[in-house]
Amino acid sequence: QGGGPQWAVGHFM
């Protein structure tokens, strides 16, 4: 990816 913590938030939450 590459755009910020947005994708990470979706994965962790």
Curated annotation (Swiss-Prot):
A Pfam family annotated for this UniProt entry: Bombesin
Tissue: Expressed by the skin glands.
GO BP term (any one): defense response
Keyword Secreted on entry: yes
Modified residues (Pyrrolidone carboxylic acid): 1
The UniProt record lists the keyword Secreted: yes
Record InterPro entries: Bombesin
Keywords linked to the UniProt accession: Amidation, Amphibian defense peptide, Pyrrolidone carboxylic acid, Secreted
Source organism superkingdom: Eukaryota
PROSITE patterns (alphabetical): BOMBESIN
Entry's localization field: Secreted
GO terms for cellular component: extracellular region
Location of Methionine amide modifications: 13
Entry similarity comment: Belongs to the bombesin/neuromedin-B/ranatensin family.
Name of the protein described by the UniProt record: Bombesin-like peptide L
Gene source species: Pseudophryne guentheri
